[in-house]
Regions:
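S-adenosyl-L-methionine
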Residues: 1-52
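Conserved SAM-binding loop
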Residues: 91
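Conserved SAM-binding motif I beta-strand of class I
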Residues: 77-82
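A short SAM/SAH-binding and catalytic strip from SAM-dependent methyltransferases
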Residues: 118-131
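Glycine-rich SAM-binding Motif I of class I
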Residues: 65-69
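C-terminal substrate-binding/active-site "lid" region of AdoMet-derived donor-dependent transferases
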Residues: 128-174
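Conserved SAM-binding strand-loop segment of SAM-dependent methyltransferases
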Residues: 98-109
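Conserved class I S-adenosyl-L-methionine
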Residues: 54-63
Length: 174
């Protein structure tokens, strides 16, 4: 009896570990592991980006959707990209009450169309920031505000910094 209990426990732990690796671990190869942006930092990002009602806000790596909710409450049209299937589902469930105002897209934001965006938020690992700059620079858009959490975009003119948040504008005069 004790031996059966051991094997059941072993398989539960093994399957849970495999699930965690598959849903959380592999995304590090595409940007960053899931580290939620603190509420205080979310509010700082919203204040920095300062969009008007009806403008389009994009969160590249929206995690559990916390920032999507804050943006939608301000009347912004919101798009969140998330590579982790579990977190994409959580973000979708948390933002359902906003209807078509919020879209959660499961997949890599490296292929995202940002041409309609007025503001973008991102929390990446430092060595991906130059790649992010290329992604944004190579897309057609009018004026785009970009807020980065914790990591600066190399060779970009910083507009403003609040706490760990960096505000940039595209196109800029480097």
């Amino acid at each position: 009896m004790l031996q059966n209990f051991f094997w059941i426990g072993f398989w539960v732990i093994w399957v849970t570990g495999l699930f965690m690796i598959l849903t959380y671990g592999w995304v590090i190869f595409f940007g960053a592991p899931y580290i939620p942006t603190l509420k205080k930092q979310q509010r700082q990002a919203i204040k920095l980006i300062n969009l008007k009602k009806g403008q389009v806000f994009v969160d590249l790596g929206c995690g559990d959707g916390g920032l999507l909710i804050l943006a939608a409450e301000r009347g912004w049209k919101v798009i969140g990209y998330e590579l982790n299937p579990f977190l994409a589902l959580v973000a979708w469930a948390r933002t359902r009450r906003f209807g078509r105002q919020v879209k959660v897209k499961f997949g890599s934001f490296w292929r995202a169309d940002l041409s309609s965006a007025d503001g973008v938020f991102v929390f990446l690992i430092g060595h991906y920031m130059a790649k992010l700059d290329s992604l944004i620079s190579n897309q057609p858009h009018k004026r785009l505000k970009v807020v980065s959490n914790a990591f600066a975009i190399p060779r970009r003119k910083l507009i403003k910094k609040r706490g760990a948040m960096f505000l940039y504008q595209y196109p800029d005069n480097r």
